[in-house]
Regions:
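Membrane-interface segments at transmembrane-helix boundaries
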Residues: 1-5, 26-73, 77-105, 129-157, ...
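Short functional micro-motifs and their immediate structural scaffolds
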Residues: 236-238, 251
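Short, non-ligating residues that shape and space the ligands of small metal-coordination modules
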Residues: 239-243
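Hydrophobic alpha-helical transmembrane segments in multi-pass membrane proteins
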Residues: 17, 21, 25, 60-84, ...
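Short cysteine-rich clusters marking metal-coordination/redox-active sites
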Residues: 230-233, 246-249
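Interfacial loop/helix-cap signal at membrane boundaries in integral membrane proteins
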Residues: 1-17
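Juxtamembrane transition segments at transmembrane-helix termini in multipass membrane proteins
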Residues: 35, 40, 94-97, 105-144, ...
Length: 251
């Protein structure tokens, strides 16, 4: 009754809410895209800097953000297409208000397409997170170029090993999930609070990032992430004796 009497107000609130959710989602995606390179930089260079990597990898982070937005729109479009196909198949049953062969066919076809689509999304997400983003970080390239390099040099011809990597990370993830759940229970759910959980489970996050980087490093010297660098000024100390003072800062 209230909606009928105040339809214009309801429509305004609804549209405003949708726009707000979209803006929050875009902001979260942007921060996540920039944050991925900050995390990689912190792990590779063994430092806790924020300002430097935020500015240094601005181009790569923004490129990843735009790439993520486009992919998100394609995912939404594909999902809508699958839903539309299912509705068209079931249309005879919908019009006759019965559940028969058309309805069953719609469920089978729609379910199969959706399952394949979900598996494709998982594989794509793994490729971007494990191979493409580190490639962008190391080669200092934008998203599309990072995609091409990662596809041609890291995935093509090595699909089997990449699948094994994903399976291994999945199994390790199950173990990490058990540890995280146990920790949350032991701390009476305090460990599940946003900031506390980020700090508490940071070693797990770092482990999985390092695991992926170590896999990539097997592809040759051009894919070396963990170089012998000075922990204070990040001077490249390759070829120098271990334990010697840094020629740049003297520490």
């Amino acid at each position: 009754v209230w909606i009928d009497a105040n339809f214009s107000l309801f429509l305004t609130i609804l549209i405003s809410g949708i726009i707000l959710v979209i803006l929050i989602g875009l902001l979260a995606t942007w921060l996540s895209s920039r944050g991925k390179f900050m995390l990689l930089d912190g792990i590779v260079k063994n430092r806790g800097a924020i300002k430097e990597p935020w500015a240094e990898y601005k181009t790569e982070g923004n490129s990843l953000f735009l790439f993520s937005v486009v992919i998100g729109l394609l995912v939404l479009l594909t999902f809508s297409l699958i839903a539309g196909i299912s509705v068209l198949i079931a249309l005879p049953d919908i019009q006759s208000e019965t559940f028969g062969g058309a309805g069953v066919a719609a469920i089978v076809v729609g379910g199969s397409l959706m399952l394949l689509f979900i598996l494709a999304c998982i594989a794509f997400s793994a490729f971007v997170k494990i191979l493409m983003v580190p490639t962008m970080y190391l080669k200092r390239v934008r998203a599309i170029e990072g995609w091409k390099i990662a596809w041609n040099q890291l995935l093509k011809g090595h699909v089997g090993s990449f699948i094994l990597l994903i399976l291994m990370m999945f199994l390790l993830g199950l173990g990490a999930g058990v540890v995280a759940t146990f920790t949350v229970c032991v701390t009476c759910c305090i460990g599940a609070l946003p900031y506390i959980s980020s700090v508490l489970f940071l070693p797990i996050t770092v482990f999985f990032v390092c695991y992926a980087l170590c896999y990539i490093q097997q592809f040759g010297g051009d894919w070396t992430f963990f170089k012998n660098m000075c922990r204070f000024c990040h001077y490249n100390m390759e070829g120098l004796e271990e334990g010697c003072a840094c020629p740049e800062c003297g520490k």
